[in-house]
Amino acid sequence: MAAARGLSLTAATQKAVTPWPRGRLLAASLGPQARREASSSSPEAGEGQIRLTDSCVQRLLEITEGSEFLRLQVEGGGCSGFQYKFSLDTVINPDDRVFEQGGARVVVDSDSLAFVKGAQVDFSQELIRSSFQVLNNPQAQQGCSCGSSFSIKL
């Protein structure tokens, strides 16, 4: 889907991703330029930002208490190379970016932000499961049918 929109990673981020010799991406780290780019503030909603859907905001307001927030991380793994990990947390680290909307907060570390910037966090409630999901990720080339794993554009 995202490939059809012609969106891609920046050159700095592309250089920072190192594929495993067999071609599967297992992990990545960002260089100084890519880290600055991932953590820089931008007024445009799509550039370096994470958008929250109304259903995400509503669900977070229901389940969080006090200083709790939703943490979004990207880890190596899953059937497509990378996977999204959601958890409730109360500690904001120095390299974290906080995205707040309507009193609900989603926090993303700078390494993970490079893989999800411009994406949207949603809460989906279906007959068989309810979950937070990352939608419309411009950094993802393809994802698996479960929606929790993806590969990045190189």
UniProtKB/Swiss-Prot annotation:
Xref: Pfam families: Fe-S_biosyn
Presequence extent in this chain: 1-8
Protein's UniProt keywords contain Transit peptide: yes
GO cellular component, as recorded: mitochondrial [4Fe-4S] assembly complex
Keywords: Iron, Iron-sulfur, Metal-binding, Mitochondrion, Transit peptide
Cell compartment(s), UniProt: Mitochondrion
Binding site for Fe cation: C79, C144, C146
UniProt-listed GO biological process terms: iron-sulfur cluster assembly
GO molecular function: 2 iron, 2 sulfur cluster binding; 4 iron, 4 sulfur cluster binding; identical protein binding; iron ion binding
Keyword Oxidoreductase: no
PANTHER family: IRON-SULFUR CLUSTER ASSEMBLY 2 HOMOLOG, MITOCHONDRIAL
Family statement drawn from the similarity comment of this UniProt entry: Belongs to the HesB/IscA family.
Subunit and partners: Heterotetramer; forms a dimer of dimers with IBA57. Interacts with [2Fe-2S]-ISCA2 forming the heterodimer [2Fe- 2S]-ISCA2-IBA57 complex; [2Fe-2S] cluster binding is absolutely required to promote the complex formation.
Function as written in the Swiss-Prot or TrEMBL entry: Involved in the maturation of mitochondrial 4Fe-4S proteins functioning late in the iron-sulfur cluster assembly pathway. May be involved in the binding of an intermediate of Fe/S cluster assembly.
Protein name per Swiss-Prot or TrEMBL: Iron-sulfur cluster assembly 2 homolog, mitochondrial
Lineage: Eukaryota, Metazoa, Chordata, Craniata, Vertebrata
Underlying gene: ISCA2
